[in-house]
Amino acid sequence: MKNTPKNIAIEKLFPFEGHPFKVQDNEEMNTLIESIQEQGILSPLIVRPKENTADEYEIVSGHRRFRAAVKAGIKEVPALIVPLDRDAAAIAVVDSNLHREHILPSEKAFAYKLKAEALRHQGKRSDLTSEQVAPKLATEIIAESDNTSKDTVKRYIRLTNLIPPILDMVDEKRIAFTPAVELSYLLLSLIHISEPTRLGMISY
């Protein structure tokens, strides 16, 4: 049976939990808002049923269109409803955005992490056969799909250990990628050193 778009009320739609890509209110967003006001949403969103709800949905693809529709005052948007579980949806969220021309280091870092966690969780599921989940490391699968190296994927994921102000500096190119990765190791070491000291102070 062919899946056809369904009009869904805006208030029944929710962003994907842990969505790693920033939806910015910039000139491109303003252009999209104007387009939606004039022509409506030409490409349907992709959504999945929200767990433990009767008629609410989580967005898999189309977060920018959703934001623009809200700002344009649209009450309903067309969407394709797909029966994806959390892990499959997370992978789809990442794969549908990594092709974008401009992606911030922080976006790629959290996207790689989200997909890696989903792939690892799929690998632990007993209802999937070995043919469905290849016996490869999650970072290897991501590297192949994004045409990069396994080490590069790991280094990006390291950035998720940085505190937000430092990660913002990486996005703003005030800190280069390699020093930022090295800094993530340093910060983790400082946390490990300070934690026993802090606990020791409390015990006295």
Language-model features, listed with the residues they occupy:
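Base-recognition residues in the alpha-helical recognition helix of bacterial helix-turn-helix
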Residues: 64, 155, 200
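Short linear Ser/Thr-Pro motifs
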Residues: 35, 149, 202-203
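Single conserved hydrophobic/aromatic residue that forms the stacking wall/gate
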Residues: 191-204
